[in-house]
Amino acid sequence: MIKLFVGLGNPGPEYEDTRHNAGFWWIDALARELKVQLVPERSYFGLMARASVRGENVWLLQPQTFMNLSGKSVGALARFFKIQPEEVLVVHDELDFEPGQVKLKRGGSHGGHNGLRDIHAQLGSADYWRLRIGIGHPGHKAEVANWVLKKPAPDQRQLIEDSIAHSLKAWPELQAGNMDKATLLIHTTKPPRPKPARPATAESDKG
């Protein structure tokens, strides 16, 4: 069962529409779905909302510490409400996936993502769930820092928004702890429409 949904990003209007804030976009969409409002909570160093879903408390969190200190916010809330690592879902941008791709996984390395690195340290465990939202890769490692802090092109932003909407369909399963079903929902996308068959030509008829 997921009790704490965390979206990673950087605070401030200058970062609002940058690729690194894809996790914030996901939490904003979930807050709209649940009809709750994220409000500042100084004790947890972030914007937080709480909802009751099927009699269970669910927390939504956007750390306001800047990306590299995200664990400070996540750890503070998780410790206070006694939420275990396996009850946490962290939604973040993923360089290794193209815009439009989204994948769910549990555990593993931080892969160089500084937000995840700090969450590892503050939770004392890597055994939490991650929802990885594809933002694409600039092609060269030296360009990554600049890439994640830039706005995606409109067509890329639309693909990211589509992947967020698609993955949100699985949030009730995530909350209920039906992780296999959630994974299937998230990882299954509609296949592209098949192209109509070419009409036979006179040459092909001849064999």
UniProtKB/Swiss-Prot annotation:
The record marks D93 as: Stabilizes the basic form of H active site to accept a proton. The record marks N10 as: Discriminates between blocked and unblocked aminoacyl-tRNA. It is found in: Cytoplasm. Its EC number is 3.1.1.29. It catalyses: an N-acyl-L-alpha-aminoacyl-tRNA + H2O = an N-acyl-L-amino acid + a tRNA + H(+). Keywords: Cytoplasm, Hydrolase, RNA-binding, tRNA-binding. TRNA binds at Y15, F66, N68, N114. The active site is at H20. Residues 187-207 are annotated as: Disordered. Coiled coil: none annotated. Belongs to the PTH family. Monomer. This is Peptidyl-tRNA hydrolase. It comes from Delftia acidovorans (strain DSM 14801 / SPH-1).
